[in-house]
């Protein structure tokens, strides 16, 4: 069996997204989920699955915004 980098990238994206839900900390969940979503964006652009890329790009933006919001809440305490 030959090594396929594109397929490996898809599996890594899946691993990060699935693993993110194992964290109790919402901060860690969002960081690991963002890594998976970024990998999915790259993977889906390579295989020209643009709806998947769009969804995961949106999720990255949501995760970054929520992490920023959590940081702002902690700074105001």
Swiss-Prot record:
Protein source organism: Haemophilus influenzae (strain ATCC 51907 / DSM 11121 / KW20 / Rd)
Give the principal location in a single coarse category.
membrane
Q: Which residues cross the membrane?
A: 3-23, 35-55
Specify the superkingdom: Bacteria
Q: Does the keyword Transmembrane apply?
A: yes
Keywords of the record: Cell membrane, Membrane, Transmembrane, Transmembrane helix
Q: GO terms for CC?
A: plasma membrane
Membrane topology is:
Multi-pass membrane protein
This chain's protein is named: Uncharacterized protein HI_1736
List locations, semicolon-separated: Cell membrane
């Amino acid at each position: 069996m030959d090594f396929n980098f594109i397929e490996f990238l898809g599996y890594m994206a899946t691993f990060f997204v699935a693993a993110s839900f194992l964290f109790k900390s919402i901060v860690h969940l969002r960081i690991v989920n963002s890594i998976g979503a970024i990998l999915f964006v790259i993977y889906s652009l390579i295989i020209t699955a643009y709806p998947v890329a769009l969804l995961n790009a949106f999720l990255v933006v949501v995760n970054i915004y929520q992490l920023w919001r959590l940081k702002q809440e902690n700074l105001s305490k």
